[in-house]
Amino acid sequence: MLLHIPALFEKDEVRRIREALEQADWADGKITAGYQSAKAKHNLQLPEGHPLAKEIGAAMLERLWKNPLFMSAALPHKVFPPLLNCYTAGGSFDFHIDNAVRQPKGSIERVRTDLSATLFFSEPEDYDGGELEIQDTFGTQRVKLPAGDMVLYPGTSLHKVNAVTRGARYASFFWTQSLVREDSQRALLFEMDGAIQQLTHDMPDHPSLIRLTGTYHNLLRRWVEV
């Protein structure tokens, strides 16, 4: 399942974040890549623990845990602290699959990467190229969203960032360990939750609503890992 989550940040917030990122001291993006990924990765990144990365990451997490679309689709258990990257002219990240487990720097906590996400901080017209290209059961999708918008997709997906040929592409990326490991089960629960919410709006007194809600929670009980 690939999901577009709009307006996690408002435009004025994005502008302030981008201005701060433009003034930041960036490091080689290979610092967080695995052995295979490092050979394919050509970008810049704020080091883990960088004050600006921590500030932006905390603001992102605050919004994510309050976002109904993210909560319904991801069913989050743990979220890896968001990282920040920058692609300038010539920057790219060839096809790869994210590591299955990530460990934040200085932490004993481990996060299984069930879901990957990218939050865009540059407007599409500010750079050429730089599309996030994702291959999975839903086919091949090229994603280049407005600043402040986010895309959520399975961590098992083969994906790349196409070369930037003009401008700069600022973004955040992170991973989520879901309460439900299997993507097809999460997709089913997401569809069911959406149907329940729509039915609640259209026919709040319908007798089937309680039964459908009960079925949703019984499926959660069967599939959730805590």
Curated annotation (Swiss-Prot):
Gene3D superfamilies: q2cbj1_9rhob like domain, Rabenosyn, Rab binding domain
Positions bound to 2-oxoglutarate: R169
UniProt-annotated binding residues for Fe cation: H96, D98, H159
Single annotated GO MF: L-ascorbic acid binding
Enzyme Commission number(s) of this protein: 1.14.11.-
Keywords: Dioxygenase, Iron, Metal-binding, Oxidoreductase, Vitamin C
Enzyme class: oxidoreductase
Domain Fe2OG dioxygenase residue range list: 78-178
CC cofactor note: Binds 1 Fe(2+) ion per subunit.
PROSITE patterns according to UniProt: FE2OG_OXY
Pfam families cross-referenced by the UniProt entry: 2OG-FeII_Oxy_3, PKHD_C
Record GO biological process: DNA damage response; intracellular iron ion homeostasis
Cofactor(s) recorded in Swiss-Prot or TrEMBL: Fe(2+); L-ascorbate
Record-given protein name: PKHD-type hydroxylase Pfl01_0799
Organism listed in the record: Pseudomonas fluorescens (strain Pf0-1)
